[in-house]
Amino acid sequence: MFNLRTLVTLEALIAFAICQDMGILNYQNQNYEAAEKYYNSILSTDSDNSEAHFGKGSSLFMQDDIKNAEIKFNESLASSETLLKSKAFYNLGNISYKNKKLNDALQFYKKALELNPNDDEARYNYEFIKYQKDPEEKKDDEKKD
C-alpha cells in the first residue's frame, strides 16, 4: 500500500545533519512541532540552509501542512548535495500524489531517480503511479471512441 506518511524520509537529512541532531531526534520521536521550531531557529540565522529547509518541510508534512511543506522542499532544492535534492524531489512527488497531480508526481519521482538511481522507494512510487494511470488513460481512450 502506498503510504505517504511512512514514505516521507529524513535519510538525506540524517546524512548531512550532525549539528542538527535535535531536529532529527524530535522528528524521530514524532514531536514534529518541536522539530519545526528547531529548524526555524536554524533558518533565522542561516536562511540558505537547505538541510534545515528540508527538515522543516518534513516536519510540516507530518503536521499536514502540505502547502508550506511543498515550499520548504522546493527551497531545499538549492542544495549542492545530490542525495538531499533527490529526497526533496521524492517528497515533492509524495505531495503531488497526495494532491492527485499524478503527472507532476511522476516527474518528481523521475528526477529523484535521476539523482539517485538506487532509490527503491522512488522507483516503486513511480511504477505504482504509472500503473494507476494506465487504466485511467484506457478509459479516456474508450470515451473518445
Predicted segments with their positions:
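Feature detects intrinsically disordered, low-complexity acidic/polar segments
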Residues: 58, 63-145
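Alpha-helical segment of the N-proximal tetratricopeptide repeat
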Residues: 18-45, 62
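Bacterial N-terminal signal peptides that target proteins for export
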Residues: 1-8
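Repeat-mediated protein-protein interaction surfaces in helical alpha-solenoids
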Residues: 2, 31-41, 68-77
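Short coil loop/turn residues that delineate tetratricopeptide repeat
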Residues: 41, 46-49, 82-84, 118
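Generic helix N-cap/helix-start motif at coil->alpha-helix transitions
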Residues: 16-19, 48-53, 84-87
